């Protein structure tokens, strides 16, 4: 089967073919949300990101990309001891328990309002807390499919809202479709040199 070269990249040398095939979806989703949608700066060390559902596939990649390529203060959520340990091993500075109110968890850890909030699952469940805790003029991104999502409460804080769907470029043959090729090659180099999978 032929595949458009604009949506493929080099295989990381230290991954099997199966592992390399599996990392594409999570990697593109994490990268595009972090750098294309939220436009996270790679140089700003005064900002923080809260990643809800950080221990899953996309979250684990996003944490590592943020750790390797930005100076963000990375805050993640988990609820089990093993996922909390996993996130700490990946480099998350503070792990919040997403079974509790996230705004109260931030206060408990004396953390300021995050500039960026990413919801990888349970967005419908967490939306009220996200509205409450995000920094004014912050950026909110998500990947799941809530049945309904009222974003009007973000208006008073002028929070921008961003969807991420890694198939958008290929489905609509966007002008920047080649970016996925470049992203996958960059991440392949990172995996070979720094990121642990």
Regions found by a protein language model. Give the residues of each.
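Glycine-rich phosphate/adenylate-binding loop and adjacent beta-alpha elements
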Residues: 1-10, 17, 23-28, 37
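Structural detector of well-ordered beta-strand residues that form the stable sheet scaffold
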Residues: 9, 50, 75, 139-141, ...
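Generic detector of contiguous secondary-structure segments
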Residues: 9-23, 140-153
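Mid-domain Rossmann-like dinucleotide-binding core that forms the NAD(H)/NADP(H) cofactor-binding site
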Residues: 21-100
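A general structural signal for well-ordered alpha-helical segments in protein cores
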Residues: 27-31, 127, 184-185
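Glycine-rich cofactor phosphate-binding loops and adjacent beta1-alpha1 units
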Residues: 41-44, 90, 94-162
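Aromatic/hydrophobic pocket-lining residues that form π-stacking "cages" and hydrophobic walls in ligand
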Residues: 62, 130, 187
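C-terminal substrate-binding/catalytic core of Rossmann-like NAD(P)-dependent dehydrogenases/reductases
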Residues: 153-197
């Amino acid at each position: 089967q032929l595949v458009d070269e604009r949506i493929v990249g080099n295989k990381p040398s230290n991954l099997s073919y199966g592992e390399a095939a599996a990392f594409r979806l999570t990697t593109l989703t994490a990268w595009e949300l972090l750098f294309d949608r939220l436009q996270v700066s790679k140089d700003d060390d005064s900002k923080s990101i809260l990643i809800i559902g950080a221990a899953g596939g996309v979250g684990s990649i996003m944490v590592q990309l943020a750790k390797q390529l930005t100076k963000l203060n990375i805050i993640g959520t988990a609820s089990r001891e093993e996922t909390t340990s996993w996130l700490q091993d990946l480099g998350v500075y503070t792990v919040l328990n997403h079974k509790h109110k996230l705004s109260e968890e931030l206060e408990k850890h004396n953390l300021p309002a995050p500039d960026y909030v990413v919801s990888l699952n349970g967005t419908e469940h967490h939306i009220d807390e996200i509205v409450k805790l995000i920094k004014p003029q912050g950026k909110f991104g998500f990947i799941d499919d809530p049945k309904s999502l009222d974003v009007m409460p973000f208006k008073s804080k002028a929070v921008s809202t961003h969807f991420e769907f890694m198939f958008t470029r290929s489905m609509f043959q966007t002008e920047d479709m080649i970016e996925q090729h470049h992203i996958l090659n960059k991440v392949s180099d990172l995996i070979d040199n720094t990121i642990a999978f």
